[in-house]
From Swiss-Prot:
Taxonomic source organism: Mesorhizobium japonicum (strain LMG 29417 / CECT 9101 / MAFF 303099)
Keywords (A to Z) from UniProt: Carbohydrate metabolism, Isomerase, NADP
EC number of the protein: 5.1.3.20
Name of the featured protein: ADP-L-glycero-D-manno-heptose-6-epimerase
NCBIfam families: heptose_epim, PRK11150.1
UniProt: substrate binding residues: 168, 179, 186, 200-203, 213, 276
GO annotation, biological process: ADP-L-glycero-beta-D-manno-heptose biosynthetic process; carbohydrate metabolic process
Length: 316
């Protein structure tokens, strides 16, 4: 059995889809379906079972789930604007620690979601503690778990443990995320409503729409997860493309693909000032050194593919 926590979420469901494509369907999805809209992400996928996240943790700690091939731990509170630190630490840190230890004794491969948000406002994006400066409680919860893994696992005899620091992920199966869905998703919907796509104006030394991130298609993220599992590599790895591109490039690709719209700039929101990453670009040296030679989609290619997927979903 393969377990995917957060399996009804964006990245988790795309990992399930990638596993299905390789012939795996003995998959246990773990999630919190209080928001039942996430079921749409699983409707076209093949899984063997589902467990609520709390029931699952009790059962795996008791050794009651039988033979497990791997755990892809994608479940988390990923709302970067959430400032309830108690809730965030319980969900992202305490839960992850318990699951990590439940996987160690039976030597179950454990691949988990970290985040590029741990780098905060820094200008270098390598997997080194000195470069990690989280700007919000979400980022801190992710950094703290990475530090815990470094301190308690990597210097011991351990089963595979791999953390993937996701940069800006976009692509299919993210509609349930609402405000936290990708910029590509929101710009597509704005244009489809007959509005102009809106981007932030000048901020933090960047011109209008020129704030830049390392945008990675969720299909490429799923590919990296499966490759690492098969490779058996342990460590903390950046998961981006290695190339920063401006938000303007996303808007231009949406406009070009849909054949309508004109970029409109809005003032940078006050509530994001001081906790916003204006630039990210993954240093991919560690993942490449581990042997990964897969290619990553550019914004122009990946966003075009995504917009076509969204159009097909609308018409179906």
């Amino acid at each position: 059995m393969i377990i995917v926590t957060g399996g009804a979420g964006m990245i988790g469901s795309n990992i399930v889809a990638a596993l299905n494509a390789e012939g795996h369907d003995d998959i246990l999805v773990v999630d919190d379906l209080t928001d039942g809209h996430k079921i749409a992400n699983l409707a076209d996928l093949s899984i063997a079972d589902y467990l609520d996240k709390d029931d699952f943790l009790t059962r795996i700690e008791a050794g009651a789930l039988g033979r497990i091939e791997a755990v892809f731990h994608q479940g988390a509170c990923s709302t970067t604007t959430e400032w309830n630190g108690k809730f965030m630490m319980e969900v992202n840190f305490a839960y992850s620690k318990r699951l990590l230890h439940a996987c160690q004794a039976p030597r179950v491969p454990f691949l988990y979601a970290s985040s590029a948000s741990v780098y905060g406002g820094g200008s270098e994006f390598r997997e080194e503690p000195a470069l990690e400066r989280p700007l919000n409680v979400y980022a801190y919860s992710k950094k703290l778990f990475d530090d815990y893994v470094r301190r308690t696992v990597f210097d011991t005899d351990h089963s595979q443990v791999a953390g993937l620091r996701y940069f800006n992920v976009y692509g299919p199966r993210e509609a349930h995320k609402g405000a936290m869905a990708s910029v590509a998703f929101h710009l597509f919907n704005q244009v489809e409503r007959g509005e102009n796509p809106r981007l932030f104006g000048a901020y933090d030394g960047f011109g209008p729409g020129e704030q830049s991130r390392d945008f990675i298609h969720v299909g490429d993220v799923a590919d990296v997860n499966l490759w690492l599992w098969k490779r058996g590599s342990s460590g903390i790895f950046n998961c981006g493309t290695g190339r920063a591109q401006p938000f303007r490039a996303i808007a231009e690709t949406v406009i070009d693909t849909l054949g309508k719209g004109e970029i409109e700039f809005i003032p940078f929101p006050d509530h994001l000032k001081g906790s916003y990453q204006s630039f990210t670009q993954a240093d991919m040296s560690r993942l490449r050194a581990a042997g990964y030679n897969g290619q990553f989609r550019t914004v122009e290619t990946g966003v075009r593919d995504y917009v076509e997927w969204l159009k097909a979903q609308r018409s179906s």
